[in-house]
């Protein structure tokens, strides 16, 4: 073997171990999905330390399968095994991650989104090989529901208390009564939060995915929100309503022509209107992201499977991706004609 191609055994085993752990983790993701969809985690949170029989009865699942599932979860540290009593439970921390929907640390939306990518893996392979785009609506419904569940805690925890107050004068306008455009609203979580918090304001929410808008309308109707309307619309076709605030939450990078969209939004704003863009956490530059952003690998993965293909399926097809970084995003906003751009 040529000296330049000799394998460093220590590095080989380190890499093999890392990949093996990733494979084990992928199995754990599927176990987590089973526990979420069947209600086992929620049943365990309700019961406290309980036998396999008790958990199976409460969650209405097969007892033998449950034992195997609990054993797998115990090995990953997802549930707690009490050897002296032969019972299983969730610690408060485990419950906050796996069982409690409204906790900011609930991981199940992310799990759901990942599982959805394995449902139509043949399409992912074809897209990767051919370079064609993949429209958002071509994904399994787990992608839509999982995305909403993943981002919901962040919006609930930060949108009203941090992001909106960080923009000078915007919150006062919303309290008095303003016009808001929520673009790329998906299932409408951000739209409903603003409509509930600011009843004097009118919220118009837009998304090009019809089934998501249908579901958002149902959810808004259940809440009785009469200051919120949903529309099926391309992001670049928002009507000129002189909006006081236009928002895009974690969707700008998915758009085929983000500069063109930003230009269109600029035209729909009132003279003193504000455009707020929220994007996934990213740093400037690949090396910087790899070394200093622990979530970058995951988001580059989502970019490969979802975000870049969604962009390439639209006119222009820039393929910005979810890890473009603040410098690039601010350059694009400046290109779109926004003269005052600040990073909050």
Question: Where in the sequence are the language-model features?
Answer:
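A short glycine-rich, Lys/Arg-flanked "PGG" loop and its adjoining helix->strand segment in the class I
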Residues: 259-271
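Short helix-to-turn junction characteristic of helix-turn-helix DNA-binding domains
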Residues: 44-48
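Conserved Class I S-adenosyl-L-methionine-dependent methyltransferase catalytic core
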Residues: 6, 10, 18-27, 31-43, ...
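Conserved S-adenosyl-L-methionine
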Residues: 338-344
